[in-house]
Design a protein with these regions (language model features):
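Short, solvent-exposed loop/linker segments at the N-terminal edge
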Residues: 39-44
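Solvent-exposed loop/turn segments flanking beta-strands in beta-repeat/beta-sandwich domains
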Residues: 54-68
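Ser/Thr-rich low-complexity repeats and stalk/linker segments
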Residues: 71-73
Length: 624
C-alpha cells in the first residue's frame, strides 16, 4: 500500500513568470577553451566522424571535412556534427574546418583514430594505467572514480583517476585501509603525476571527493581535495604550505579500529599540470567534537561531499560538505591569484539553521535555482544559496528525515526556466518531485519504506516528457511530470546517458546501455562492454560518464582488468545539433561532482528532450 499525496498549493505559472524576469541578468561563466575534439571511428565500411560544436561559436556554424587534404562534402555541413566516409582507411588523416560567413576560419587537429568497435553502436580505445603495487597492509588497487579536466591547457581532456585499495571501508565498518592515490593520464595513457593522500586519509566512498576544474581561469584545471599529514604531492614532496608547514608527516593518526578521528585535516589545491602542491588551508568544516555529528566512533563525522559551483556568476568555486545524517555543514572555497580562501560557511548548528539538520544526501547537485546567473547547492532535501544561506528544506513539507541516496536536478518541462528536484527518501520513504526553489512538492508517493534509488529522465521519444521511477512498489511504475502512471519502469534504476541519437536518454547500468520502450515494456540492448566492468559494487557506476569529445553525446569509461580504462563512444547516427555539453556550466560542474559519494549521472542546465525548441538558447559563457 502506498499513499499519493496530492500537489501542494503552488502556482507554477506565477513562479515561471517571476523566474523568467531574472533571465538575461547573468554574467558570462568562464569555461574551458576546447579544441574541436574530432574522432574517426572504424566501421565495417570506412569511418564514422564526430566533432564538437563549441558553445562559444554561432549555432549555424558550417563545417567542411577533409581526408588527406581532399574535401569530402559538397555543401557545408550545418546539421548534426557527424559524417560517414565509406572510403576511409586506418591510414587516413581527417581534419574539420569551421566556416564563418562562407569562409573557412580554422582547422582542427587531426582526428583521433579509433579502430576498435563493440558491435554496431560503439567504438572504443584503451588507456593503459600504471597500477600501484600492493599496499603495505595488503590492499590491491583498482581504478575507481575518475574525473576530467584540461590539465595542460591544450584544449583536450585529461583524466584524474582515483586508485582505491581492496581494503577500503564504508564509514559504518571498522578496518585499517591502505592509501588512496590520485593519478593523472592523457587519453593516450601518459602518466603525468601521482598524488598519495597518505595514511591519514581513510579509503572509502565517503571520504575522498576530488574536484577537478579550472578554478583560477588560467586555462588549466587544478585539483582540490581533502589532505592530511602524510600527503605527498605529484612531485614527490610532502605538502608544506599553510598549516601543513610544520606537519609531522611520519605521524599516524588512525586508531586501532581504522577510524581517523584526531589529527590535522587540510584542504589542498594541486597544479593539474604537474601535481605540485599550490596551497593548503585548514579543512573546514572542522571535525571538533566527534559525537556532535551523531555517533562517537567516527562514522557520521566523516561523511563528506563536494561540488563545483559558479557562486559569483563568472568564476567557479569549490564546495566541501561535512555531515548530513544530523549536523550538516559546508564551506565554499576560491582559488584566485595563488591563494586558497574561504568564501563562506554554512552550519546547521548556527541559530536559524536548525531545521537543516539531517537534510542531506549521499551526493550534491548544482543548478541556477533562482535563474539569476549564480549557482545554488542542492543537498537533496535542502538548497543552500550562492551566498551560503539556507534557502529552503523539506523538513516540514515532505520528510523531517530528508536523507536520500539519489538525486536528479535539471529543467524538466519545455518552456519552463525552473529546474526541478527529484529524489527518493529513506526513513519514511517515498519519491518526490518539487521545484528547486521551493520545499512545496508537486507530488509525493509515500510508501513508508527505504527508497534507495530513483531516476528522472525522458526515456522514450514516443511518450513525450520526463519520466520518473525508483525502487520499491511505487518505483515499479513509471510516472510522468504530473505524477500520472504511463507504464512500467525499467529494471535499471541507475545512470541515464545520451547515446542512440534521439533526445531521450538511455539506461546505463553496470557495463550495459539499453533503450527502454515504454509502450512495449521492453529494453533494446545497445551496448555490452565485453570484458569491462563497472565500479562501486552494487552501485554499478561507470568510472566516468561525460561528453569528452565528438558531438554532444556522452562517452562512458569502464575499468578493464585493473590495468586499463576502456573509453566507449557512440557510432549511432543523429539528426540533432547541440553544442558540446561540456560548455553548459551546469553539466560541466556535474562532471566534477559526479565522483562525490554515491555517483549520479550528470544533467544539463537547460531542457533537452524530444519536444525541445531549436536552436537552443545561446550559452552565456566565455573562455580564458
Amino acid at each position: 500500500m502506498f499513499h499519493y499525496l496530492l500537489p501542494r498549493r503552488l502556482s507554477l505559472t506565477c513562479i515561471s513568470i517571476f523566474m523568467s524576469l531574472a533571465v538575461g541578468l547573468s554574467a558570462q561563466m568562464q569555461v574551458e577553451a576546447l579544441q574541436r575534439g574530432l574522432v574517426a571511428i572504424h566501421q565495417d565500411e570506412g569511418f564514422y566522424l564526430s566533432w564538437r560544436l563549441l558553445g562559444t561559436e554561432p549555432y549555424e556554424t558550417g563545417f567542411n571535412i577533409y581526408r588527406d587534404g581532399e574535401r569530402l562534402n559538397q555543401e557545408p555541413l550545418t546539421g548534426a556534427t557527424i559524417f560517414s566516409d565509406p572510403e576511409g582507411t586506418p591510414e587516413s588523416s581527417y581534419v574539420v574546418r569551421a566556416l564563418l560567413d562562407g569562409a573557412e576560419v580554422d582547422e582542427s587537429e587531426p582526428a583521433r583514430m579509433i579502430l576498435n568497435t563493440e558491435g554496431p553502436n560503439a567504438g572504443y580505445f584503451d588507456i593503459p594505467l600504471q597500477r600501484p603495487e600492493t599496499g603495505r597492509l595488503g590492499g590491491t588497487y583498482s581504478p575507481n572514480d575518475t574525473s576530467a579536466g584540461d590539465l595542460n591547457g591544450d584544449g583536450h581532456y585529461e583524466l584524474v583517476v582515483m586508485w582505491n585499495p581492496s581494503n577500503a571501508r564504508d564509514n559504518a565498518h571498522r578496518g585499517i585501509t591502505d592509501d588512496v592515490l590520485l593519478d593523472a593520464y592523457t587519453l593516450d595513457g601518459e602518466l603525468l603525476w601521482r598524488i598519495n593522500l597518505g595514511p591519514n586519509i581513510r579509503a572509502g566512498a565517503h571520504y575522498t571527493q576530488f574536484m577537478v576544474y579550472d578554478f583560477d581561469g588560467n586555462g588549466r584545471s587544478e585539483i582540490m581535495v581533502k589532505t592530511a599529514p602524510g600527503t605527498v604531492d605529484g612531485q614527490g614532496n610532502a605538502i608544506r604550505k599553510g598549516p601543513a608547514e610544520n606537519a609531522d608527516h611520519s605521524a599516524i593518526y588512525r586508531n586501532a579500529t581504522g577510524y581517523i578521528i584526531e589529527g590535522p585535516e587540510y584542504l589542498t589545491v594541486f597544479d593539474g599540470l604537474n601535481g605540485a602542491e599550490l596551497d593548503t588551508a585548514e579543512y573546514f568544516p572542522v571535525r571538533g567534537d566527534v559525537s556532535a555529528w551523531g555517533d562517537s566512533h567516527g562514522n557520521r563525522v566523516d561523511r563528506f561531499n563536494a561540488a563545483v559551483a559558479y557562486l559569483g556568476g563568472e568564476r567557479p568555486s569549490a564546495v566541501f560538505q561535512r555531515g548530513y545524517y544530523t549536523r550538516l555543514t559546508m564551506a565554499a572555497w576560491d582559488w584566485r591569484d595563488g591563494q586558497l580562501t574561504r568564501r563562506w560557511t554554512f552550519d546547521s548548528d548556527e541559530p536559524g539553521n536548525e531545521s537543516y539538520r539531517g537534510q542531506g544526501n549521499h551526493q550534491l547537485s548544482v543548478a541556477d535555482v533562482n535563474n539569476n546567473g549564480r549557482h545554488e547547492i542542492i543537498t537533496g532535501p535542502a538548497v543552500i544559496d550562492s551566498e551560503g544561506r539556507g534557502q529552503h528544506n523539506v523538513a516540514e513539507t515532505i520528510n523531517p528525515d530528508g536523507h536520500g541516496d539519489a538525486l536528479h536536478v535539471t529543467q524538466m518541462v519545455k518552456g519552463d526556466p525552473i529546474p526541478y528536484i527529484f529524489m527518493p527518501f529513506e526513513g519514511a520513504g517515498g519519491l518526490a518531485l518539487r521545484p528547486a526553489h521551493s520545499p512545496e512538492y508537486l507530488w509525493y508517493f509515500h510508501e513508508g519504506i527505504d527508497y534507495g534509488r530513483g531516476v528522472a529522465a525522458e526515456l522514450d521519444p514516443e511518450v513525450l516528457g520526463f519520466h520518473f521511477w525508483g525502487s520499491g512498489e511505487v518505483g515499479s511504475n513509471l510516472f510522468n511530470f504530473n505524477g500520472e502512471r504511463v507504464g512500467n519502469s525499467p529494471s535499471s534504476v541507475n545512470h541515464v546517458i545520451w547515446w542512440n541519437g534521439d533526445l531521450s536518454r538511455e539506461l546505463l547500468n553496470s557495463n550495459t546501455i539499453e533503450q527502454w520502450h515504454i509502450r512495449e515494456n521492453r529494453p533494446t540492448r545497445l551496448l555490452t562492454a565485453e570484458g569491462a566492468s563497472s565500479i562501486n559494487g552494487t552501485k554499478a557506476n561507470p568510472n566516468l560518464q561525460a561528453d569528452l569529445f565528438g558531438d554532444w553525446r556522452e562517452e562512458v569509461i569502464f575499468n578493464l582488468n585493473d590495468t586499463h580504462l576502456r573509453v566507449y563512444t557512440t557510432t549511432m547516427p543523429t539528426e540533432y545539433r547541440l553544442p558540446t555539453l561540456m560548455h553548459d556550466p551546469v553539466y560541466r560542474v556535474a562532471i566534477a561532482w559526479q565522483n562525490s559519494s554515491y555517483n549520479q549521472p550528470p544533467h544539463p542546465g537547460y531542457y533537452i528532450a524530444t519536444d525541445m525548441d531549436f536552436p537552443p538558447a545561446p550559452l552565456k559563457i566565455k573562455t580564458p
